[in-house]
Amino acid sequence: MQIISSYGVEIKKQNIPLRHTMDIFRQAVSYLIRVYAETWEELSGIGNAQKRFNEAEHLVHETKKNHARFDFDCRFPKMPSYLRRAAIQHALGSVSSYQTRLALWEGRELSGKPKLTCENHAMPVFYRDVMYKEAETGEDTAHLKLFDGCDWKWFPVKLLHTDMEYLRKKWSGKKASAPTLEKKHHKYFLRFSYTEEISLSKTPVKEQVIC
């Protein structure tokens, strides 16, 4: 079976635009929630999840072959494509959850009419190579693509030595997921998730001994 573990690495205080990046991502999610709430009737008619996602992206992202119906690209220019797609996925999940709860309320299976809240606590994911780059082995740094208020740029980030030592000792050689930015107690962290394959004991439950 698979076991997923995660660990948050503290980002040392420095003059980098983490707050700007978090804010612009949440603003994008809020905007998209409104868009998908407005267009849910047509989106919900698409049964295949990937096709629904593609249509949701076509609604807001302009390409040579696609004219977007909504002005997301103008409001959030140059947003990295992976981050835009993460925002779309989060917004779709929020609207889908609301619609499910609304249907339960209408069927009298849920007390209290649910509300669709555009305010959110979504945190950006830093996809490897395009948003996140690891430093050389043994160094307590990384590079993140952050929003400085005008553009998306690469910034060096200093990470807490004790946290990095723990990862190197505990998870060396294991593949981590793309890190997610977190904020707790006025501090910022990069949270990494690791997946392990664990073999279950074949001994019958009644014969297992807990030491």
Indicate residue ranges for each PLM-predicted region.
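Nucleic-acid substrate recognition interfaces
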Residues: 1-211
